[in-house]
A protein has these predicted regions:
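A bilobed periplasmic-binding-protein/Venus flytrap-type ligand-binding module shared by bacterial periplasmic
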Residues: 98-108
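C-terminal regulatory
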Residues: 1-98, 124-128
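Short amphipathic alpha-helical coupling segments at ligand-binding clamshell hinges
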Residues: 107-121, 127
Length: 128
């Protein structure tokens, strides 16, 4: 188990001594702040080097599950029965903008309205 071997980070600066799994920068980043673990708590002008890069969130989840290191995962990706634990819960990821786009002619559609309300409810319940 990764945390048994490397210990729990107690503060953001401790991430300097951990293996971080991030979204590979060779791919277009889906969210510009997705790799914020490389910078949070780091010395000014110093960015951590990732131990492992992956090109999708599910791959990051599998890498963490496999004990390769720590990653920033949205809570909806971690099943309730998972053996993964949240570290540094007092730290939140930077805010991310998200857009729900649909054709203008569908603006009065009941389906669009219901789906929009569903999305807003789910986003309000999710932590990143």
């Amino acid at each position: 188990d990764y945390l048994r071997e490397f210990g729990y980070p107690q503060q953001p600066e401790d991430l300097d001594h951990h293996r971080l799994i991030v979204y590979g920068e060779a791919q277009p980043l889906p969210v510009t702040t997705i790799n914020w673990l490389l910078e949070v708590g780091a010395q000014p002008g110093h960015q951590r080097r990732p131990a492992f890069t992956v090109n999708n969130l599910y791959g990051m989840y599998l890498a963490v599950q496999g004990g390769l290191g720590l990653a920033n995962l949205p809570d909806y990706m971690v099943p309730p029965d998972s053996n993964l634990v949240q570290v540094l819960p007092e730290i939140s990821s930077p805010p991310t903008q998200c857009y729900f786009v649909y054709p203008e002619e569908m603006r009065h559609s009941k389906r669009i309205e219901v789906f929009r309300e569903f999305l807003l409810r789910k986003v309000a319940e999710t932590q990143f």
